[in-house]
UniProtKB/Swiss-Prot annotation:
Component of the small ribosomal subunit. The ribosome is a large ribonucleoprotein complex responsible for the synthesis of proteins in the cell. Part of the small subunit (SSU) processome, first precursor of the small eukaryotic ribosomal subunit. During the assembly of the SSU processome in the nucleolus, many ribosome biogenesis factors, an RNA chaperone and ribosomal proteins associate with the nascent pre-rRNA and work in concert to generate RNA folding, modifications, rearrangements and cleavage as well as targeted degradation of pre-ribosomal RNA by the RNA exosome. Pfam families: Ribosomal_S7. One of its GO terms (biological process) is ribosomal small subunit biogenesis. Component of the small ribosomal subunit. Part of the small subunit (SSU) processome, composed of more than 70 proteins and the RNA chaperone small nucleolar RNA (snoRNA) U3. This is Small ribosomal subunit protein uS7. Its main location: cytoplasm. Belongs to the universal ribosomal protein uS7 family. InterPro entries: Ribosomal_uS7, Ribosomal_uS7_CS, Ribosomal_uS7_dom, Ribosomal_uS7_dom_sf, Ribosomal_uS7_euk/arc. It comes from Dictyostelium discoideum (Social amoeba). One of its GO terms (molecular function) is rRNA binding. PANTHER family: RIBOSOMAL PROTEIN S7 (PTHR11205). The modification N-acetylthreonine is found at T2. GO terms for cellular component: cytosolic small ribosomal subunit; extracellular matrix; nucleolus; phagocytic vesicle; ribosome; small-subunit processome.
Length: 190
């Protein structure tokens, strides 16, 4: 009897793909895990966090800031509830929705400061795939946190809403708004 490894015992990893070629190596969905907790030391070596499952990276990002810092069990529970809501609303695999949300939320272009002898100007630069994924996960969790603050809706509902809107590329999503603002400023600094 062989049983397939599924996230939270429900969501299958088979069929989850990343259509964006540049992000395929950095959005890790190949490691099949039951729960998004590996206790791995992904920050010890440069670029090793690319091997960390994307759901675990979302959980780690969810438990940042203030009163929720370090509460990984709570972060994992929020993600599990959000995935249930996503499945009920979209009838799609929540892992695929997450991959699409991360893919759509990462800015492709940014601006950096270039300065010499006191004069500073901004220059538009392309964003590396690793930074795109990092920034996308950060924007998704920041938008979720902002939506849930002083709101009757639960964090899981806000996370599900943010992921669904970001996967569709909807301007209602906080992460898509921030990405567009970043790319707009980068375009003005070309």
């Amino acid at each position: 009897m062989t049983s397939e490894v599924a996230l939270f015992g429900k969501w299958s990893y088979s069929g989850v793909t990343c259509p964006d070629i540049s992000l395929q190596d950095y959005i890790c969905v190949k490691k099949n895990v039951f729960t998004p907790h590996s206790a791995g030391r992904y920050n010890k070596v440069r670029f090793r966090k690319a091997q960390c499952p994307i759901v675990e990276r979302l959980a780690n990002s969810m438990m940042m800031f203030g009163r929720n810092a370090g509460k990984k069990v709570m972060a994992v529970r929020i993600i599990e509830q959000a995935f249930e809501i996503i499945y009920l609303l979209t009838d799609k695999n929540p892992l695929q929705v997450l991959v699409e949300a991360v893919m759509n939320s990462g800015p492709r272009e940014d601006s950096t400061r270039i300065g010499s002898a006191g004069t500073v100007r901004r220059q538009a630069v392309d964003v590396s795939p690793m930074r795109r994924v990092n920034h996308a996960v950060y924007l998704l969790t920041q938008g979720t946190r902002a939506a849930a603050f002083r709101n009757i809706r639960t964090v899981a509902e806000c996370l599900a809403d943010e992921l669904i809107n970001a996967s569709k590329g909807s301007p209602n999503s906080y992460s898509i708004k921030q990405k567009d603002a970043l790319e707009r400023t980068a375009k003005s600094h070309r």
